[in-house]
Swiss-Prot record:
This is Small ribosomal subunit protein uS5. With S4 and S12 plays an important role in translational accuracy. It holds the Pfam family Ribosomal_S5. One of its GO terms (cellular component) is small ribosomal subunit. Part of the 30S ribosomal subunit. Contacts proteins S4 and S8. It comes from Phytoplasma australiense. Residues 15-78 form the S5 DRBM domain. The keyword rRNA-binding applies. The keyword Ribosomal protein applies. One of its GO terms (molecular function) is structural constituent of ribosome. It comes from the Bacteria. Transmembrane segments: none annotated. Belongs to the universal ribosomal protein uS5 family. The N-terminal domain interacts with the head of the 30S subunit; the C-terminal domain interacts with the body and contacts protein S4. The interaction surface between S4 and S5 is involved in control of translational fidelity.
Length: 171
């Protein structure tokens, strides 16, 4: 009799995922309370792509899996110059406002909250100055950071939009 050996190779994803928040949510029904879990997950490749999502499920593990899959479908590309961002930007979402400023090499991520720091680490930005204004709820801060990152443009993109050409020393 021939034995068949199967090798299970775990698929390695180029994306790193971090769970920002897990909370138990409750639905009150006629017979009592129904409990589920909600997970907020950020996914990035530490080069230039980032995405986030929330998902709910009966078990924590299932909620995280669902959120990771959703986040991978919503990835966006961010322009990065070296280890920082090309210019100042402000992101808005709801009552949250998030200011991002480029910083010199070696500064690190100066961010007040864990949610914003997670997003910036996973997108691949290692030198940036930030300030959060207004609401500091983790989901609102993440959405404000993402809005700010979406507004970033490189020199080349701005020049093209304005119909200009860059000098050789500016490139």
């Amino acid at each position: 009799m021939k034995t068949i050996k199967k090798e299970f190779v775990k698929k390695t994803s180029p994306y790193e995922e971090k769970v920002v928040k897990i909370k138990r949510i409750t639905k009150v029904v006629k017979g009592g309370r129904r409990f589920r879990f909600s997970a907020l997950v950020v996914v990035g490749n530490k080069k230039d792509q980032i995405g986030f999502a929330t998902a709910k499920a009966q078990e924590i593990v299932d909620a995280i899996k669902k959120a990771v899959e959703k986040a991978k479908k919503q990835l966006i590309r961010i322009p990065i110059v070296g280890t920082t961002i090309p210019h100042d930007t402000i992101g808005h979402f709801g009552a949250s406002k998030f200011l991002l400023r480029p910083a010199s090499k070696g500064t690190g991520i100066v961010a007040g909250g864990a949610a914003a720091r997670t997003v910036l680490e996973l997108v691949g930005i290692s030198d940036v100055l930030t300030k959060t204004f207004g609401s500091r709820t983790s989901i609102n801060v993440i959405r404000a950071v993402m809005d700010g990152l979406k507004n970033l443009r490189t020199k080349e993109e701005v020049a093209k939009l304005r119909g200009l050409t860059l000098a050789k020393n500016e490139q």
